Each structure stands twice: as C-alpha cells, then as structure tokens.
Amino acid sequence: MASGVMVSDDVVKVFNDMKVRHQLSPEEAKKRKKAVIFCLSDDKKTIILEPGKEILQGDVGCNVEDPYKTFVKMLPRNDCRYALYDALYETKETKKEDLVFVFWAPEEASLKSKMIYASSKDAIRKRFTGIKHEWQTNTYDDINDPCNLADKLGGNTVVSLEGKSLRS
C-alpha cells in the first residue's frame, strides 16, 4: 500500500554521499556521515532528515566512543523512524563497510505511526538503490544487541562490529 509520501532531495543526497566511497581528504572524511535518521515531516507528507540526528565519521573515537550504541540511543522509544547506518565490520576473511537501511517500528509506537511508516517505506527504499542490507526491528532489546546487526550483515561469519569482538 503506497502512502503518497514524498522523499526530500536532502534525504537522497545524504544517501548518495554515504553510498559513494572514494578518496576523501582528511577533513572531508571527518564530515562523512556514519549514521543518519529520517522521519516524517510534521504534515506527514515528506520523509526528511531528522534535525540533529546524525553521527559523523569525525565524531567516532572523539566524542562518540561506540558509534553503534550512540546510533541506537538516537532512536525514539515510542515512534517509528528510518535510518542509514554505515557498518564497519570484519568477517573471518576480510574487513568490510556496508550501508544498512533500518526501519525502526517499536512496539510502543502508535498504530497510526506504524501504519504510515510501513506504507511509506517503499518510497524511501526505492530511492536508496544498491542497498544490500535492510533491517526492520521492533524492540529495543533486538536493536540494542550488535549481534543482531551482525546477523543481517553476514551471520556467523561476522566476528567484529565497529572494531569490537562479537563472538568468543
């Protein structure tokens, strides 16, 4: 079911900037987004960037110790959101970096919010071409455990996420 919700050009630009991996100067690399959260505009007609809800690569290791935990804390407990998370992980063979599209629909969100976000997901998903990993999660316990993200990225082959070991 389509909701008729539009995706703002800023959202598409952020996605394209996060998706393209090319040589950046050290200053440009610091400004690259590690995570960003999207929400519906107040009139519920457009998917927009949620103000102040982003993590920059330059923040990691400075004022953001654990980017994944910081990302999870940015999500509201009682409302839906879409997000992009640039996951840095290691498999048994190699280090990888992939974008993950997250649809956060917590059980505590209103039925109306869940319905409009669910029916609008295709609008944003169609604009995010080339995403390999998509994750819909509904409980804080589920999203708070980095092993669940690792399962989406490659299951048991993932040994670390953001430089932190996952399995012993």
UniProtKB/Swiss-Prot annotation:
Q: Which residues carry this modification: N-acetylalanine?
A: A2
Please report the PTM annotation for this entry.
Answer: Inactive when phosphorylated. Phosphorylation levels vary during development. Oocytes contain only the phosphorylated form, and 80-95% of cfl1 protein is phosphorylated in unfertilized eggs. Rapid dephosphorylation occurs within 30 minutes after fertilization. Phosphorylation levels increase again between the morula and blastula stages (5-8 hpf) and then decrease again as gastrulation approaches. Dephosphorylated by pdxp.
Q: Where in the cell is it found?
A: Nucleus matrix; Cytoplasm, Cytoskeleton; Cytoplasm, Cell cortex; Membrane
Q: Name a Pfam family for this protein.
A: Cofilin_ADF
GO BP terms in the entry: actin filament depolymerization; actin filament fragmentation; actin filament severing; cytoskeleton organization; cytoskeleton-dependent cytokinesis; regulation of cell morphogenesis
SUPFAM superfamilies per UniProt: Actin depolymerizing proteins (SSF55753)
Protein name per UniProt:
Cofilin-1-B
Which species is the source of this protein? Answer: Xenopus laevis
Q: Which gene encodes it?
A: cfl1-b
